[in-house]
Regions:
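Hydrophobic alpha-helical
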Residues: 136-153, 222, 241-308
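Short beta-strand elements in bilobed, periplasmic/extracellular small-molecule ligand-binding domains
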Residues: 101-112, 175, 203-206, 226-246, ...
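An alpha-beta-alpha
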Residues: 77, 81, 86, 96-98, ...
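Extracytoplasmic "Venus flytrap"
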Residues: 32-95, 99, 103, 108-121, ...
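Solvent-exposed loop/turn segments at secondary-structure junctions
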Residues: 83-87, 113-115, 140-143, 164-168, ...
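Flexible loop/hinge segments that line or gate small-molecule binding clefts
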Residues: 35-41, 141, 147-185, 203, ...
């Protein structure tokens, strides 16, 4: 990955005084904040500004593990990918491969090609390898429940990446640990960026995929945090399933622009890809790439999102996953499992990438993670 910097973010405690309300029409929910709250939400604005400043920091020290077992030799890891066309899944796979070379292990990748049958077949191929450990790369283990049970019966530890909504160990499904950022923190900092950048005065469109519980929860949390600021108005909640984003987003954005006009000043989306598809419609409407609506993706932060941000092309910010770093963490967690130790418990802090702090990079990872894991493994 091209960037190895990081930022820590303060966890902001807040009270939501009122919720957004509205009516549903087709795929969109029109909504606005209600209730008597202090104009401009000065207290919430101050919290948001502090959180965003911390999340945009690129020089914070490594906050991950510094102690653990030496490298356990002679292991083979199978990486079962939901689909290698997903930039997040493939980015983590590259991190696993890189870390495995350092620790002295072999890695095989099995591509599920994005279908339930493909995932089950890939998992079955991984089991046939009789690996030391298996990575659940970006899918719910329930999609391959039979294979996961066989792995457990064979004593093969499973580690997930985005396999469950929460980070850490899981008993149902049975995972040694699950590597992901906390959805609550990603959602809150995305909303805080809008509140802080707009100084508490924004008209927001929120893009989600309500068919995915994890995505819906993320957008619900973003909506809840935005509602804490009386002068931030949720203009529309757009429910566009991710598989349909490439065919529906342009028409939806064109309709939004016609209906909302200059009231629409900010957007948030549960995945950066919505802004890739929104760009042509915004361009056709005469919007400048670095102008309103200012868009933030609460998604993986894939290279195409970084390209849009660096080029100031209809996306101003993203909350990226540290993909390579998470690949290294997965290898470290396996090493702990093989050594009979518990999971590290580490969860990467959220970070906000903008054109001002990206340095032209196409990814984000914490500063010093490679050195930290090498030291732990004595490699």
């Amino acid at each position: 990955m091209l960037s190895t910097r990081k930022a820590t973010v303060a966890v902001v405690t807040f009270l939501v005084a009122a919720a957004a309300a509205g009516c549903t029409s087709g795929s969109a929910t029109e909504a606005s904040t209600v209730g008597a709250r202090e104009p401009g939400c000065p207290a919430v604005l101050a919290e948001a500004q502090q959180a965003v400043k911390a999340a945009e920091d690129i020089n914070a020290p490594w906050s991950g593990p510094t102690r653990g077992p030496d490298a356990v030799p002679g292991k083979t890891i199978a990486y079962v990918a939901q689909t290698m066309t997903n930039p997040g899944v493939s980015g983590v796979a590259k991190g696993v491969q890189e870390a495995a070379e350092v620790i002295g292990w072999d890695v095989r990748t099995f591509d599920g090609e994005g279908t339930p049958a493909g995932i089950r077949n890939a998992f079955a191929e991984a089991l046939a390898l009789k690996p030391s450990g298996i990575v659940i790369g970006g899918f719910d283990p329930a999609a391959a429940a039979g294979q996961a049970e066989r792995a457990g019966a064979a004593g093969i530890p499973l580690i997930g990446w985005h396999a469950t909504p929460a980070p850490g160990p899981s008993t149902d499904p049975e995972l040694f640990t699950n590597v992901t950022t906390r959805v609550e923190e990603v959602a809150e900092i995305s909303a805080d960026w809008i509140i802080a950048r707009s100084e508490g005065h924004a008209g927001v469109v929120l893009f989600t995929d309500a068919s995915i519980p994890f995505a819906k929860r993320k957008s619900d949390l973003i909506r809840k945090r935005l509602a804490a600021c009386s002068d931030v108005e949720l203009l529309s909640l757009q429910d566009i399933p991710i598989p349909e984003a490439n065919t529906r987003t342009v028409d939806e954005v064109t309709s939004l622009q016609s209906r909302l006009g200059d009231r629409w000043t900010y957007s948030a989306a549960i995945n950066d890809l919505y802004f890739d598809h929104a760009a042509p419609a915004l361009r056709a409407a005469g919007h400048k790439g670095d102008g309103a609506p200012f868009n933030i993706g609460a998604g993986d932060g894939d290279p195409s999102a970084f390209e849009r941000i660096n080029g100031k092309r209809y996306q101003a910010a993203t909350v990226p996953e540290p993909l390579s770093e998470q690949g290294w963490q997965i290898v470290d967690e396996f090493n702990r499992a093989f050594a009979g130790e518990p999971a590290s418990g580490y969860v990467a802090p959220v970070h906000i990438t903008t054109a001002d702090n990206s340095g032209g990079a196409l990814s984000w990872d914490s500063e010093g993670y490679r050195q930290a894991y090498r030291k732990i493994w004595d490699r």
